[in-house]
């Protein structure tokens, strides 16, 4: 069960990170580029 929880935590972290990257990218900051 621990592996299952770690997997979900990692998935949520990656999802949140990708959303944040899209938001920051659309803000026109320019300091963060991918």
Swiss-Prot record:
It comes from the Bacteria. The chain crosses the membrane at residues 3-23. GO terms for molecular function: electron transporter, transferring electrons within cytochrome b6/f complex of photosystem II activity. One of its GO terms (biological process) is cytochrome complex assembly. It is found in: Cellular thylakoid membrane. Its main location: membrane. Keywords: Electron transport, Membrane, Photosynthesis, Thylakoid, Transmembrane, Transmembrane helix, Transport. It is a single-pass membrane protein. Pfam families: PetN. One of its GO terms (cellular component) is cytochrome b6f complex. Component of the cytochrome b6-f complex, which mediates electron transfer between photosystem II (PSII) and photosystem I (PSI), cyclic electron flow around PSI, and state transitions. Belongs to the PetN family. This is Cytochrome b6-f complex subunit 8. It comes from Prochlorococcus marinus subsp. pastoris (strain CCMP1986 / NIES-2087 / MED4). The lineage of its organism: Bacteria, Bacillati, Cyanobacteriota, Cyanophyceae, Synechococcales. The gene is petN.
